[in-house]
A protein has these predicted regions:
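Positions in alpha-helical segments
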Residues: 29, 58, 99-101
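Gly/Gly-Pro-rich "capping" loops immediately C-terminal to redox-active cysteine motifs
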Residues: 47-78
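The canonical Cys-X-X-Cys-His
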Residues: 35-46, 114
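Hydrophobic helical h-region of N-terminal Sec-dependent signal peptides
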Residues: 9-15
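Electrostatic cytochrome c docking/interface patches
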Residues: 15-34
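Bacterial N-terminal signal peptides that target proteins for export
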Residues: 1-9
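C-terminal capping alpha-helices of c-type cytochrome domains
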Residues: 91-125
Length: 125
């Protein structure tokens, strides 16, 4: 799978954090758990937090309606505002500016799990 990452990202330090996941039996369940832990502070990710999120952050159910939803989710870490606080091993930081949210680390495999969860939202529409 090809992942696009803008060349604007220079070099910097990665912050390593651990992400405990509950016991889930499949990719979509793991993706939901990751979404709940990492994304729900800004986005409505489904019925879990339908009254949550930040007002100007699009909900997962809204974003999945876009024809390029999969690419957007797979490359979210390179799309503003995510690069300031999202760390992906093997990719340089976007800026030396301090993050305005606590930074977190996510792997490309974990992003694939989130996409598996989001696909269930798309299929349920």
């Amino acid at each position: 799978m090809i992942r696009i990452f803008p060349s604007v990202f220079a070099s910097a330090l990665l912050t390593v954090t651990s992400l405990p996941l509950s016991r889930a039996s499949n990719s979509a369940e793991l993706g939901f758990e990751l979404s709940r832990q990492l994304c729900s502070r800004c986005h409505v990710i489904g019925e879990y937090n339908r009254m949550g999120g930040i007002g100007n952050s699009p909900s997962f159910t809204w974003m999945v309606k876009s024809s390029d939803w999969r690419e957007r989710f797979l490359t979210f870490y390179s799309r503003r505002p995510h690069p300031v606080f999202t760390r992906v091993p093997g990719y340089a930081l976007w800026s030396d500016a301090p993050p305005y949210y606590p930074p977190f680390e996510i792997t490309l495999d974990e992003i694939d799990l989130i996409v598996a969860y989001v696909e269930t939202l798309r299929n349920s529409q």
